[in-house]
Amino acid sequence: MTALKLDGVTAIPSDITRLQLGLSEEWIDTERRRSAGSTFVHFASSLCFEEKNKGLICDHNINGLRHAVDVASALKCDAFIYISTAFTVGIHEGHVAEQLHRPAAFNNYYEETKCAAEHLITGLCGAKGLRLVIVRPSVVIGPSESCKTGGSKTGLYGLIREMHRLKRHLKHVSVVADGNPDAGVNLIPVDYVCHDIFRLFEDPGVQSGPHHATAHNNVKIADLVELIKRHMGLPNVAVQRLERLDTERDSAIERLLARTTAFYNSITCATKHFERSAGATWVLGTDDVERYVIEAVRACESGEGHAPNQEKIAAPEDRVASNVYAAGTICAEPAAFGNGVSDPV
């Protein structure tokens, strides 16, 4: 793979929950002269999924998207790249086409808002004359070279983190976790996703609409759980499909594990095969997956997100607290690169 070139990237503080992203008219007027004909790339969204957070999720994933499109239009951009998720297909299993979905139901409110956002952005960009490319990553993991977590606590790392948090209890009892051992989960290294995004960005002839940023193959849940058990020292954990949580038969630790890992049911219980019409073929072997599990467990046990010198909590204007890390010696104006949940990228 060729190295990504990020020369000329400038970070501008903004807030997707505010009109015009909180940017001043003066700034937009100035930038319009430089940005005309450019491409607007929208990463930011909320990964919250619980019903109790519906207002916050909608504010970020729906209203925030409206505000972003308004700014892209005001800047006279030609194209809009929207980073969505491969799981807008909801409870559907099997083949997943690169098209807009209207599933019968969703696994959680996060999936529902991201699906609604894809339909919304399609209409908005069409009305404003913006060429639209929707990028759908699957479960994003660390870079393929180092396999480090980068401080991420979501996706695969969230699942491992919850199991590690309960490790003291899980070591001494037999526990059955809800999941389909025969199902497959699609994991994709973050640098592969970035290369897909840049490929779509650099190709003016790319087809409008959804494009999957996914691996060519799935990882079997039974194999993934076995790797986690081996490297975490949890031989008594088993995975099987449970029709419902039985409060009388299931142990307290099983009920607790079910609650804390509820978000991951959509990837541990059903298999999705994502269509990928163009781009490189990304394949993850068992040895690759094991390296990721080893790094994730190591990060949990060492307490290191990614070995920052300093860690603080920042509360930006959008009210979503973020972990802020500093590493090395700051001898110039600092720069930060983050995704929608402030994970370093």
Question: Model regions: which residues?
Answer:
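Mid/C-terminal beta-alpha module of Rossmann-like enzyme folds, strongest
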Residues: 196-259, 293-339, 343-345
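Conserved C-terminal active-site "lid" loop/helix of NAD(P)H-dependent oxidoreductases
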Residues: 190, 222-223, 248-282
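Active-site Tyr-X1-5-Lys
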Residues: 107-138
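NAD(P)H-binding glycine-rich loop region in Rossmannoid oxidoreductase-like domains
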Residues: 5, 13-63, 75
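Conserved Rossmann-fold NAD(P)-dependent oxidoreductase catalytic core, especially the SDR/UDP-sugar
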Residues: 39-44, 51-55, 59, 63-109, ...
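Glycine-rich phosphate-binding loop and adjoining beta1-alpha1-beta2 segment
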Residues: 1-9
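A conserved pocket-lining segment of Rossmann-fold NAD(P)-dependent short-chain dehydrogenase/reductase
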Residues: 53, 146, 156-192, 196-200
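Glycine/proline-rich active-site loop of Rossmann-fold NAD(P)-dependent oxidoreductases
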Residues: 143-156, 200-211
